[in-house]
Amino acid sequence: MAATDLERISNAEPEPRSLSLGGHVGFDSLPDQLVSKSVTQGFSFNILCVGETGIGKSTLMNTFFNTTFETEEASHHEECVRLRPQTYDLQESNVHLKLTIVDAVGFGDQINKDDSYRPIVDYIDTQFENYLQEELKIRRSLFDYHDTRIHVCLYFITPTGHSLKSLDLVTMKKLDSKVNIIPIIAKADTISKSELHKFKIKIMGELVSNGVQIYQFPTDDEAVAEINAVMNAHLPFAVVGSTEEVKVGNKLVRARQYPWGVVQVENENHCDFVKLREMLIRVNMEDLREQTHSRHYELYRRCKLEEMGFQDSDGDSQPFSLQETYEAKRKEFLSELQRKEEEMRQMFVNKVKETELELKEKERELHEKFEHLKRIHQEEKRKVEEKRRELEEETNAFNCRKAAMEALQSQALHATSQQPLRKDKDKKKVGGWSSIYSVTIP
């Protein structure tokens, strides 16, 4: 026998012994205690209605719970699909029910329907995430927490009588791992019984061939196994909704009045409304809640914890405690943090070096530019000095020539001023001799 088998046998817990009681103890009242506690606490049930605008989702919900929920009418011009949740407090006898109805407003109204399913998937994941965050709190209060996880998705199929639309197949395929899907044919009174029967067979065949997993009513409980097995054969349910009362015979019944006759909502020969209501509310409501928690939510929780690095065992199938997982994840985080810090430090050093090189290159370029400008300045200065010397030389030469000219002009002026004076003297001398001559000659 292998060592691992021996360890497994040695670590296995011993089988509990069965003992008989000598008298009445009282723990047989545990079911009554559980019922009393549940009734005091109340219940929550969340329904997601997916279908095209105007297909009768709100009317069917009003018919289901025999009341009128105040809802806004949706238009056919929504830019995108949006989820509209509304919560109501209902009471039947002494049982309180917090009912949330989530309507996928604008589904199927867009020209491009490729991502019509995405807001629905995101909404379901958001409710799972909110519940997971509440569970992971140190001080959590799940007793008072309003559970908004979707327990069932009623998928309304348009009664075309031919086959499912591509949008329906894609959407249900995206949702089947996240929510319990119950497909229903809306406004079933618009097609004949023979067409309806063929349509049901066609729908189930397409769902199976495309691998879409819809909710199957459980048959493992003997109390409801027989009726659930029969009802599974009626899927998808063909329903008619109406809040109007019509007099049939001596009774007022909920029905739809047509010129050719009356379609009674609660007449099983006319539609499957009663079957759907019985299966959804009276028989399998708790199973839908349990399936949501134990299957769909656990799948989401497991995937999220695995993304965070948590696991139950290592590669050798050795179990991990939460403390060990935390320590391993902490060491991994610290090593990753150190690696990131080293990368950041190295990036910073490299950036500093690159910046220094860039600054040195800029400094060299500026120095070269400065030297170039300096040489240009010196050359210009030398040229200016040469021009200044040439100008001074020309100025001196000009001044010399000017002085010489002034001297010549002065001499010429002086000579010119002396010559008239001499002429005057000569004239005076000639005039004197003439008078002498005039006196002496008789």
UniProtKB/Swiss-Prot annotation:
Modified residues (N-acetylalanine): A2
Pfam families: Septin (PF00735)
Domain Septin-type G: 41-307
Region (G3 motif): 103-106
Composition skew (Basic and acidic residues), residue ranges: 1-16
Paired cysteines (S-S): none
Tissue expression notes: Expressed in cerebrum, hippocampus and cerebellum (at protein level). Expressed in heart (at protein level).
Segments of this protein annotated with the region G1 motif: 51-58
GO biological process: cytoskeleton-dependent cytokinesis; protein localization; regulation of intracellular protein transport; regulation of protein stability; regulation of SNARE complex assembly
Compositional bias annotation for Polar residues: 411-420
One GO CC term on file: axon
Cross-referenced InterPro entries: G_SEPTIN_dom, P-loop_NTPase, Septin
Positions of region (Disordered): 1-21, 411-442
Record-listed Phosphoserine modification sites: S10
Coiled coil: 322-407
Annotated keywords: Acetylation, Cell projection, Coiled coil, Cytoplasm, Cytoplasmic vesicle, Cytoskeleton, GTP-binding, Membrane, Nucleotide-binding, Phosphoprotein, Synapse
One annotated GO molecular function: SNARE binding
Subcellular location: Cytoplasm; Cytoplasm, Cytoskeleton; Synapse; Cell projection, Axon
Binding of GTP, residues: 51-58, 106, 187-195, 241, 256
Region (G4 motif): 186-189
Subunit structure, interactors included: Septins polymerize into heterooligomeric protein complexes that form filaments, and can associate with cellular membranes, actin filaments and microtubules. GTPase activity is required for filament formation. Interacts with SEPTIN7. Interacts with CDK14, SEPTIN4 and SEPTIN5. Interacts with VAMP2; the interaction inhibits interaction of VAMP2 with SYP. Interacts with STX1A.
Function: Filament-forming cytoskeletal GTPase. May play a role in platelet secretion. Seems to participate in the process of SNARE complex formation in synaptic vesicles.
Family: Belongs to the TRAFAC class TrmE-Era-EngA-EngB-Septin-like GTPase superfamily. Septin GTPase family.
UniProt protein name: Septin-8
Organism: Rattus norvegicus (Rat)
